[in-house]
Amino acid sequence: MDTALPWFKDAFPIYLAPMAGVTDKVFRQICKGYGADVLVTEFVSAEGVFRRNERTREYLDFDACERPIGVQLFGADGTHMAEAAKQVVDWVAPDFIDLNFGCPVNKVVAKNGGSALLKDCPTLTSVAKAVVDAVAPLPVTAKIRIGWDADSVNAVRVAEILERCGIAALAVHGRTRAQGYSGEADWRVIGDVAQAVTIPVIGNGDLFSPQEVMRRRAEPKIAGVMIGRAAMSAPWIFRQIKHYLATGELSPAPELSERWDAIIEHCRRHAENWGDEEQAIRAMRARLMAYSKNFPEAKALRKKFQHVATLADVERIAEEHLATAATMSDFVGQAFLPATA
């Protein structure tokens, strides 16, 4: 496949999806450690960059160990988007710029950003072309949904437009904007997009297991996949996927102790980055709720996570949870021991 993005050459890259409030620098690096091939920042307001807003600029921060990494921009003004993209390239030199044409959130759509541009192809075209021209030869990619709603599924047309604009690769989430994250992702439409264009197409939606990724890799012309919500509760899914694609064998989830080590490290680094431990740990509560999924005694854990305010709180909960799990394991083991005379 002829592409300006080298990670597609003779490979099937696994992307970490950009998720607002989730894929900050700390979490991206955790996922990279577990095997994510390509990272993308949380979406960044092009208007904020254009106006040199310092808070916006914080979202652009990444470390060299995260490469290859792209900065994702959203906006609807082609001139401002182009200038913002040039500023981003000058400031942080990402490996690519990514354009958000898929976000379903009301506050983004209300400003004609994100998935709103799926029903405004002239503006989408002007934005894509302006950014591609502004940062050339740096590659520009894009992420879309399959359409605005069930009556306007136009992903193939949008993909063809974006390819003509010079977009180097396209991630397609298999839901409409109206669906949000409900219902099932329509991989038939993702496949239609992949057949319609010559640029790499990355499939996204309902990839919660290595088996599902293997299934999608086998579909014609799908060049890679993007993992989103599954990584929020299990960043080690990247390691499991890589193992399964390489060997055809399923590897178990990490031991409970390793999962807790990852959570505590995430909290510790998040607190260091914020410089205010209590504020940082309180901000981590929603992330801890996601981590608790598929943990033993998950409901009880979630109740405890609602009140954490320090790293010591998290460490205490981990210690108690591991002790309880060990006791239960010993009890189960004793229950199945053979009777003795």
Language-model segments: residues:
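Glycine-rich, positively charged N-terminal anion/phosphate-binding segment
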Residues: 1-10, 19-95
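Alpha/beta catalytic cores of nucleotide-metabolism and tRNA/nucleoside-modifying enzymes
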Residues: 1-15, 20, 25-26, 139, ...
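Active-site beta-loop-alpha junctions enriched in small/polar residues
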Residues: 19-21, 44-46, 74-76, 102-104, ...
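Conserved beta-strand positions in the central sheet of alpha/beta enzyme cores
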Residues: 39-40, 70-72, 98, 141, ...
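Alpha/beta enzyme core
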Residues: 82-113, 121-199
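Hydrophobic alpha-helical membrane-association signature
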Residues: 120-127, 262-263, 284
